[in-house]
Amino acid sequence: MLKLTPRQAEILAFIKRCLEDNGYPPTRAEIAQELGFKSPNAAEEHLKALARKGAIEMTPGASRGIRIPGFEPGAANEDEGLPVIGRVAAGAPILAQQHVEESCQINPAFFHPKADYLLRVRGMSMKDIGIFDGDLLAVHTTREARNGQIVVARLDDEVTVKRFKREGNKVWLIAENPEFAPIEVDLEQQDLVIEGLSVGVIRR
């Protein structure tokens, strides 16, 4: 398989996640919504590029006609463990290869919902709920979050772990340490992306 761009790798990871979680691949519209494309046509162009590189196979005329050669949901991830993500570069996808420090041999299904990666925690802003500097945070990738959940959020290209609270167009990213003030986000003026939910912590 030819080398993928960061965006192509992100799409491939989303397809695998849908196969793992649902048993079937996403539609073009679902890919466009997940990745923030303006239309399914943009997703189609990326899928064609992935097919040219041998990463996927496409069935013409089928909305979910995407398969990954040799990919068996559940089998590969359990053998390979979970990628450990270190410092995330501004603007780059979290699962971009340059962020992967190592692999941790733990079954993703140990967590619920299933973990997609482990994020190395930086700092002590969440210490009051037992998340410390250097811990590995198990993260389930999703763009949705409910009030009170612990999220991995990307704000103006910086990735942070905080408790999520939303009221209308305002979001607060709240630390679990009184030394850190809540981060107030105006969704009409700032770019906030939910990268995933905390589903567990590993201390080494």
UniProtKB/Swiss-Prot annotation:
Keyword vocabulary terms for this entry: Autocatalytic cleavage, DNA damage, DNA repair, DNA replication, DNA-binding, Hydrolase, Repressor, SOS response, Transcription, Transcription regulation
UniProt xrefs under CDD domains: S24_LexA-like (cd06529)
Active site: 125, 162
GO BP, sorted A to Z: DNA repair; DNA replication; negative regulation of DNA-templated transcription; proteolysis; SOS response
Role description: Represses a number of genes involved in the response to DNA damage (SOS response), including recA and lexA. In the presence of single-stranded DNA, RecA interacts with LexA causing an autocatalytic cleavage which disrupts the DNA-binding part of LexA, leading to derepression of the SOS regulon and eventually DNA repair.
Similarity field: Belongs to the peptidase S24 family.
PANTHER family: LEXA REPRESSOR (PTHR33516), LEXA REPRESSOR-RELATED (PTHR33516:SF2)
Protein name, UniProt field: LexA repressor
Native source species: Ectopseudomonas mendocina (strain ymp) (Pseudomonas mendocina)
